[in-house]
Amino acid sequence: MKRNIVIMDFSGIYQEEQFYEGEQISWIDLSDISGTNCYCDGDAQAQILERMEKYPVSGIYFIDSGNYHYMSRIGIGRVKEPFNLLVFDNHTDMQLPAFGGLLSCGGWIASALEEVEKLHEVWLIGPDEEAYGQVEEPFKDRVHFLSRERLAEARPYMAEKKGSEEELIRSLEIPANIPLYISIDKDVLCPEEAATTWSQGDMTLEEMLKVLLALCSHFEKENGKILQVDICGECDSDKSMESPKNDHANKELLRFWKKWF
């Protein structure tokens, strides 16, 4: 069966990278659609969905820079069964835009919680405690945080004790009997590991991959289902000299996810 690896090209930055070379990929050119940078209007959403129509939900989707992280909201809108959402991000992405009718990269999770009936709960890995405090009350009952501070506290323990990632995943209590959609913004990584358009966290790529392995192993053991993974966090197209770091991170993430799709 052909693996579904999709490159969603808004900015042209993927043309500066090579992580997908030698892979059977699908390339969706979205660079001609106006009204997409950071915010996405209704007309743009309709055009994007039309171009995605022939591609299945299941698969590995690369969705450009964090300016286009709202693509995750568009992606989960195609899911037809009840599911949970796990997000790696340095930000909560729960700030609804001031203008109605627009989907934003900084508010797509809030939009999903309000509008996607099939979405049960959200797990966010990476934002700091202060960001959690700013989440609006109606959302807090359905959003679970693994904060930047808690990750920092766990880091020495994870480095010393084998199996600590499994303990961390168990502590999150993500149910394996409900399908899971995963979204990764590389801005959760430290600047040495990725170069993004937004402020960054301090997670290493190795730490992320260990946590993902523990999660996927848990789901495999429990016969759970991972619906899709999408990955964003490229740099601006006019800063392509930073692309090698992202290219390496994308290559390692693709290598990892190919084992699970």
Model-derived segments and their meaning:
Residues K2-I63, N67-N84, E117-F139, V143-F261:
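Catalytic cores of soluble, metal-dependent hydrolases
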Residues G66-H69, G101-I109:
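Short acidic (Asp/Glu) patches
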Residues L85-P97, S104, W108:
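Long, hydrophobic, well-ordered secondary-structure blocks that form the structural core
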Residues L96-L102, G133-P138:
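Active-site-proximal loop->helix
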Residues G100, S104, Q200-M203:
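Short alpha-helix boundary/capping segments
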Residues S104-L113, V122-P127:
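Conserved beta-alpha
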